[in-house]
């Protein structure tokens, strides 16, 4: 096993997580779902999946709302008879005491800072435009959605610029190694061009994306 992999998986055991393998309720087109699969892959953890088509309303059925998530959203990580929504919470659960979470308390806070940034400044803009343009289609957008596009484009570019400035001075978002912050931000950054964002404008992000893809046990998004 490579030294990097030993460090990441140190102290991890699937039996410490759950009696049975965790199950990810997901749509494979979702970057939020992909984060969880990438975390499990880097840690060498087994992860079953159950797939839903969000465009077909499969997460809004009475059965899903009653048994998986009353909010009608995915991803949801099922651990034995418990259900954990929110992608970054699920990644945190899987990573536990592995090296994907820094041991230093300030570094942990920095990691969380970037994970909050991803959910508040990055994902609402970049992921939303990707969904609207790549899956829904510009012609199918409502007038309200079309009116929001410019603001989301500007905010998404601002988020990418912040990331690029940060990565100009370092290889990873926190410390000297990959962490959950990198996984959280990779998911929708590497698909940003599907939302009309030009990643060629951000060379430090481009180099970081290559480093992520070169990690042992990396898996691509389906």
Identify the residue ranges that each predicted region occupies.
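GST-like fold's C-terminal all-alpha helical module
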Residues: 115-211
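GST-like domain detector, emphasizing the conserved glutathione-binding G-site
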Residues: 7, 11-147, 164
């Amino acid at each position: 096993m490579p030294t990097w992999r030993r460090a990441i998986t140190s102290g991890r055991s699937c039996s410490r997580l759950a009696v049975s393998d965790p199950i990810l309720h997901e749509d494979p087109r979702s970057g939020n779902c992909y984060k969880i699969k990438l975390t499990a892959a880097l840690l060498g953890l087994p992860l079953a999946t159950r797939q839903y088509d969000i465009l077909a309303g499969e997460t809004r059925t009475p059965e899903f709302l009653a048994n998986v998530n009353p909010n009608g959203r995915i991803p949801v990580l099922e651990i034995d008879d418990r259900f954990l929504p929110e992608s970054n919470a699920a990644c945190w659960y899987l990573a536990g005491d592995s090296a994907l979470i820094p041991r230093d308390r300030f570094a942990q806070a920095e990691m969380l800072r970037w994970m909050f940034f991803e959910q508040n400044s990055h994902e609402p803009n970049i992921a939303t435009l990707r969904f609207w343009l790549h899956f829904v289609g510009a012609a199918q957008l409502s007038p309200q959605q079309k009116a929001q596009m410019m603001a989301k484009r500007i905010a998404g570019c601002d988020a990418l610029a912040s990331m690029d400035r940060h990565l100009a001075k370092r290889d990873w978002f926190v410390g000297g190694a990959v962490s959950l912050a990198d996984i959280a931000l990779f998911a929708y950054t590497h698909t940003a061009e599907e939302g009309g964002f030009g990643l060629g404008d951000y060379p430090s992000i481009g180099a970081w994306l290559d480093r992520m893809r070169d990690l042992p046990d990396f898996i691509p998004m389906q």
